[in-house]
Amino acid sequence: MSKSSVFDSVIDLPQRELTERENILLGFESRYESVHNQLNLLLNQGQLLDWSKKYHKSVLPLCKLVAEQYPLVIFHGDVGTGKTATAECIANRIVRESRTEDSALFKLSNRVRGSGKVGEMGTLLTQAWAEVCEAAGKNRRAILIIDEGDSIAASRSQNHSHHEDKVAVNTLIQGVDELRKFGGRVVVILCTNRLSVLDPALRRRAAIVEEFTRPGLTERESLFRMDLGGMGLSDSQYRQLALATGEKEHLPAWTYSDIRTRLYPAAMSRAFPERALSFNDLMELLKIMRPSPVMGDI
């Protein structure tokens, strides 16, 4: 496997595209605020001593404890709730606000699972860590996003856990441990649908654990207002759409992804190119379409 294929993408930060994407991520500001301070602390461990001397006239003992945090953030929750998109935008925002121009964002590819050859997955993960560390060098900042983290970080104690899986988890844990030497310049954001299946040793290392849930009634209505502006819908119609995408009988509520990647295209295909999109196009589809099944921890 070539170097580039270990990652789905490697991009320099900040990116204007990610900055613009913040505007369509419903609830991004509140999510950013909830993790900003702690993430900022994690990313700027090298400045703790100066901060302590400035405001406490000495180095507080807890500075060392905080500086020893593992540079691992876990975003967990049901499928389609915006974990990966939020991780990318938060990484971009942190870099932009810190004015750290020399930064890179890596997205680990699921291809690191390899083809099943003995030792392949561990080797590919080791290669990925090496590339991230090389990119960080002596001064750069690097942020690694691992999507579908449960596919390579499941508990080693599971009955169906194979030797290859255990090696991969060991490699992942060792990699996170080694990243502490960068003093916060390299951080891993692991996204997973199922927090409960992650290896306990990895979960214990997480400095931040943030849960993502399916949007509630108010959030769904806000989403429709954001996305369907210009259609001339009434307040009542927005509320009907929000109610129609809610939990009912044995079906869960719709996810952000369900609405944006399934409902909208299906509705537009009914109208394009001969007429305008209508409220009825959406409502009729909601009678026959179903939300994605729950994939997270129950």
Swiss-Prot record:
Residues that coordinate or bind ATP: G80, T81, G82, K83, T84, A85, R204, R205
SMART domains reported for this sequence: AAA (SM00382)
Example GO molecular function: ATP binding
Stored InterPro entries: 26S_Proteasome_ATPase (IPR050221), AAA+_ATPase (IPR003593), ATPase_AAA_core (IPR003959), ATPase_AAA_CS (IPR003960), P-loop_NTPase (IPR027417)
Signal peptide range: none
Domain of life: Bacteria
GO biological process: defense response to virus
Keyword Methyltransferase tagged: no
Keywords recorded for this protein, A-Z: Antiviral defense, ATP-binding, Nucleotide-binding
Role, per record: Regulates complex assembly in a CBASS antivirus system. CBASS (cyclic oligonucleotide-based antiphage signaling system) provides immunity against bacteriophage. The CD-NTase protein synthesizes cyclic nucleotides in response to infection; these serve as specific second messenger signals. The signals activate a diverse range of effectors, leading to bacterial cell death and thus abortive phage infection. A type III CBASS system. Expression of this CBASS system (Cap18-Cap6-Cap7-CdnC-CapW-Cap17) in a susceptible E.coli (strain MG1655) confers resistance to bacteriophage P1.
Subunit organization: Homohexamer, forms a 1:1:6 CdnC:Cap7:Cap6 complex.
Protein family per UniProt: Belongs to the AAA ATPase family.
Protein name: CD-NTase-associated protein 6
Source organism of the structure: Escherichia coli (strain KTE188)
Lineage of producing organism: Bacteria, Pseudomonadati, Pseudomonadota, Gammaproteobacteria, Enterobacterales
